[in-house]
């Protein structure tokens, strides 16, 4: 049984109401966009299932659902770079979340050791598309 109420057919209640009614997709997931609460840097995009969202709300520490490992994932549990949630928002139809976080430890969010998972820029030139590295300082 879900702790979150089902979305009503009344679109206005979803878009303008005060009830938090997250809309999970057919796989039981909701997209989570994560930014640094201090400077707004985009850190990562992940997914949450109902349990991950519930634990995030209960503990104030970001939890996600790993689609590749098919398991619950407390971000930073192994590295020490836990994500403390400062603010949690939802979009207009409540099918995406935005987490503003403080990252503990030395700050990397990406499993590659970088601050952000978005460390490459897509560049199109002369009919060719390539990736170029973006330094952590440029992010």
Swiss-Prot record:
- Cellular location(s): Cytoplasm
Amino acids binding Mg(2+): 91, 93, 95
Asked if the Swiss-Prot or TrEMBL record annotates the protein with the keyword Thylakoid, the reply is no
Q: Give the residues the record marks as binding Zn(2+).
A: 92, 110, 117
Q: What does the entry comment about cofactor binding?
A: Binds 1 Mg(2+) ion per subunit. Binds 1 zinc ion per subunit.
Print the keywords alphabetically.
Amino-acid biosynthesis, Cytoplasm, Histidine biosynthesis, Hydrolase, Magnesium, Metal-binding, Zinc
Q: Which Gene3D superfamilies match?
A: 4.10.80.70, Phosphoribosyl-AMP cyclohydrolase
Record-given protein name: Phosphoribosyl-AMP cyclohydrolase
Which species is this record about?
A: Brucella canis (strain ATCC 23365 / NCTC 10854 / RM-666)
Gene behind the chain? hisI
